[in-house]
Regions:
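SF2 helicase/translocase NTPase motor core
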Residues: 19-33, 44-48, 55-89, 98-153
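A short, exposed loop/beta-hairpin motif centered on an aromatic-Gly-Thr core
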Residues: 37-40
């Protein structure tokens, strides 16, 4: 599998391209240097289909996102972001201090930039929301706005 960032596509050399083209309408088979190659749009939803078929398809965030803020993700954060941007539903039950906040914000920022999401709702204790989430958004994502809503129930 070859990632083609300029074309926003994945190139696959397959024995049975119909396996992919039957599930991904935009997938096209063409010949390159005498070899049939299947070109698939590199988007979160097509990545999920390829993974469900058993391919080790990378998330498009790795080739198309400029990591916001002064940090680049650690390996575990990179894996978390990969999963969050491809799977429509995901729980992150990692331990404290493993970078869940930044991973979530990077995922949201990427999905927002490609038009997949418009808003996010973060539900957590008020103390965590103000200190952790607020500071991370302010420091690493100056392009994002946030509001804190709280109540007695």
């Amino acid at each position: 599998m070859l990632v083609l960032p300029q074309q926003k596509a994945l190139a696959l050399k397959l024995r049975n391209p119909e396996k992919v083209t039957s599930l991904i309408e935009e997938a096209r088979v063409f010949e390159w240097k005498g070899v049939p190659v299947t070109l698939v749009p590199h988007r979160p939803e097509t990545t999920l289909i390829l993974r469900n078929l058993g391919f080790d398809a990378p998330s498009p965030i790795h080739s198309r996102y400029q990591w916001s803020g002064r940090y680049t993700p650690f390996h575990a954060q990179s894996q978390t972001v990969d999963i969050k941007t491809v799977h429509p539903r995901m729980y992150n039950c990692s331990d404290m201090g493993t970078g869940k906040t930044l991973s979530t914000l990077w995922s949201y920022d990427y999905l927002r930039s490609i038009g997949r999401v418009k808003r996010a709702l973060i539900v957590c204790p008020l103390s965590t929301l103000s200190v952790t989430w607020g500071e991370h958004i302010f420091e690493h994502f100056p392009n994002l706005n946030y509001a804190v809503l709280h109540g007695s129930r």
